[in-house]
Regions:
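Bacterial N-terminal signal peptides
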Residues: 1-8
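Intrinsic low-complexity/disordered segments
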Residues: 9-12, 70
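Short glycine/proline- and aromatic-enriched beta-strand/turn motifs that initiate or cap beta-hairpins
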Residues: 12-63, 74, 144-153
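Short, surface-exposed connector motifs at secondary-structure boundaries
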Residues: 16, 117-125
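Residue-level detector of the transmembrane beta-barrel scaffold of outer-membrane proteins
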Residues: 20-22, 50-54, 85-89, 124-128, ...
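Solvent-exposed loop/turn segments connecting transmembrane beta-strands
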Residues: 24-36, 57-66, 96-104, 127-139
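Gram-negative (and chloroplast) outer-membrane scaffold detector with strong preference
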Residues: 38-119
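Outer-membrane beta-barrel "beta-signal"
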Residues: 68-70, 108-110, 134-153
Length: 153
């Protein structure tokens, strides 16, 4: 019992966490379709979860527009340094357009990313398909920062 209590903090300390930045393009196909660029920040607080915030600026119905989306995501293979990783998420989105009232939406996302366990590289792409006030499609690149112990594995 005493050994289990001593090992519990060590096991938790080795849990894979990460901080991520992303940049890409997004479009939402809806009655007033949106197209623009997006920047994202995400934190993986534990093994297979990620909390992601994306902010996009562009146009909708020929007017300046912005979108914000926050999702909690489940990563199927978060430590994979090769291949692709699948993830799914649920959250909320807000869309605003000049001279129009803003609107909030439920956000559902399904994504595919290259090597979710690799920190950096030109191959760290992602693509997403989801629903958030219309059909949302996004693609871009991610930079990741992992704990120092991860780079030595």
């Amino acid at each position: 019992m005493a050994a289990a209590l001593c090992l519990a903090p060590a096991a938790h300390a080795q849990q894979l966490t990460a901080t991520e930045l992303s940049a890409g393009a997004a479009t939402v196909l809806a009655r007033r379709s949106f197209i623009g660029g997006e920047l994202g920040f995400a934190r993986r607080p534990s093994g297979q979860s990620r909390v992601a915030l994306t902010v996009a600026g562009g146009t909708a119905a020929n007017r300046p527009a912005a979108r914000v989306q926050m999702t909690w995501q489940f990563l199927v293979s978060p430590a994979a340094r090769r291949g692709t990783g699948l993830y799914a998420g649920l959250g909320a989105a807000y869309a605003a357009r000049r001279a129009s009232p803003g609107a909030g939406f439920l956000a559902v996302v399904l994504g595919l990313e290259a090597a979710p366990g690799r920190a950096r590289g030109p191959q760290n792409w992602y693509v997403e398909l989801g629903l958030a006030g219309g059909v949302r499609v996004a693609a871009g690149w991610r930079l990741r920062w992992f704990p120092s112990w991860w780079s030595t594995r």
